[in-house]
Amino acid sequence: MSATPGSPRPTPLRVDVVIPVLNEAHVLEKSVTEVRAFLAANSDWDWRVVVVDNGSTDGTDRVAKMLVERHGDVQFVQLPQRGRGRALRQAWTQSDADIMSYTDVDLSTELAALPKLVNGVASGQYDLGTGSRLLPDSQTTRSFKREFISRCYNLMIKAVLWTSFSDAQCGFKVVSRRVVQEIVPNIKDQAWFFDTELLVLAEKHGYKIMDIPVRWIEDDDSRVKIVKTAWDDIKGVARLRWTLWFGTFQPASASLPVSSRAPGA
């Protein structure tokens, strides 16, 4: 939307794209370069790429610090403990952005879906958005083993937790400040189940979820131990079912940082 001549320039939407990493020195620079190029070419947001390192031992931190020195729109957060959920919680709750998001470092999910999710949340029509590998229009390339486990897991979630979203664990999500303030503090998991818990708590308490098909290509070098992760997720589902039956949920009111970014910077 163009501004009226002589009127103040509208403040651009502040968007953080978080990339959690663990021992990804070999691919981090390439991935950050791709994300930055996409954002520069496909958005008018005031964006920032936030790399969060969870205890890497391969020099990932050195690569991240080099990227920060080279690019003013890259930020680095270093944590001693592992866990994707822990990384997202730290980055999102420290953010001054209007919209927070994340993508896996392997960029398995095509970035073309990001503007649609961000715009959907920014419009106020949705509170959070997630990519899905399991909708009819999704384009997914992965092994039979991963496809089978993923479909079984998501069917289990629907059966046990009575959810309507299609894919809990796709590493491609967008959230509003409201979700970070009210939902994230209630999430118990610090690892892979964080995504599922985020979506389930949001849906069960009336937050609107945008669920869209994405193009997704499996990373052959993925560090995810899929069988162990699946077992941990099953235990997480059982815990969450118990919480929904017998626990209490109070939307938190976590205080998030006020933006220190210069308008249009």
Q: Where do the model's predicted regions map?
A:
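Hydrophobic helical membrane-anchoring modules
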Residues: 1-14, 158, 162-163, 186-265
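Short, acidic, metal-binding catalytic loop of nucleotide-sugar glycosyltransferases
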Residues: 34-46
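Acceptor/aglycone-binding surface of glycosyltransferases and processive sugar-polymer synthases
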Residues: 73, 79-95, 99, 111-192, ...
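A conserved acidic beta->alpha catalytic loop
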Residues: 53-61, 107
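N-proximal low-complexity "stem/linker" segments adjacent to membrane-targeting elements
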Residues: 1-37
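Acidic helix N-cap motif at the loop->helix transition within catalytic regions
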Residues: 26-30, 58-67
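Short beta-strand/loop segment that forms part of the nucleotide-sugar
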Residues: 43-56, 77-78
